[in-house]
Amino acid sequence: MMNNTDFLMLNNPWNKLCLVSMDFCFPLDFVSNLFWIFASKFIIVTGQIKADFKRTSWEAKAEGSLEPGRLKLQLASIVPLYSSLVTAGPASKIIILKRTSLPTVSPSNERAYLLPVSFTDLAHVFYLSYFSINAKSNSFSLDIIIALGIPHNTQAHFNH
């Protein structure tokens, strides 16, 4: 049963999206266009279309570190998500399960931690517009689903 579901309305001029499902948050590094996640499970858009990401293992670089390693996920793009976001209408919504806070797990040798952020912050940083509604549904079984638009300053990386 899902309560307090957020629907992100996509507003992306390149019609490209990065969809990330995670259990725990890790630092985001947009210089190398990588998302750090602990476990990616489901990516669901309206119509129950599922997409998977390629995952590669990453080990902590700190010498003598007991970090078991984490998963490294390259920034993914779906071009296009639909033939046209204009004509897709409600189908361009992505369903996410809202949580009030996101646990962060970061190795001690890393300088920055990803603090819990609100979806308002995400919408501002990643150029998304959204609205919130309350909904109840037993049709989905998923963890945190986040839809991220490609930031303007990384667009050049996707032209190569």
Curated annotation (Swiss-Prot):
It is found in: Membrane. It comes from the Eukaryota. This is Transmembrane protein 191A. The keyword Cell division does not apply. The keyword Transmembrane applies. It is a single-pass membrane protein. One of its GO terms (cellular component) is membrane. The chain crosses the membrane at residues 24-44. Keywords: Membrane, Transmembrane, Transmembrane helix. Its main location: membrane. Belongs to the TMEM191 family.
